[in-house]
Amino acid sequence: MIALLLAQAAVAATPAWKLADRTNPAGVRSISASVTGNDGLSRFVVKCDVGTEPIVSIQFIQPQSLGQGADKPVAVRFDGGPAFTYSWQFPGTGTYIIDPEAITRLTTFLVKSKTLRVETTNGAGFAVQANFAAPASDAMVRQVLGVCGYTLGVVPPPPPPPPAPKDTQ
């Protein structure tokens, strides 16, 4: 009986992934799958924003500022394995990456894992890290990626170049 109660408590303590799908008054759709970290404060987000063009991002959000500044390395580890390190953008309290190859690799590993860990530094150079539960299935991540035209596990082709200006002479 005690083992059953402990098992139920462990399941209840695992943060659940949540899907949010919104459209703002300007018609920009934003859909995301996110989870709160084991610390109860950090968040890991897979997001698609569809405005003039679709943009997929992976975001790591902290309650304390990570510092605004130049891009810097962020490492993501799945199930305690080797780090996948990419250069992420740092606008302030969070950090994000929009590189399609990185998004593809990170989401592919994310949906096959049980846990993930994000490691970086804040604006003062101090280590910042957070642990998260991976999603129980790939459904939410597939849904988010699909809205932006991505297929899980497939790097999308680059967008076509803009049309050349017409000669007015």
Feature map (PLM): residue ranges:
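Hydrophobic h-region of N-terminal signal peptides that target proteins for export
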Residues: 2-13
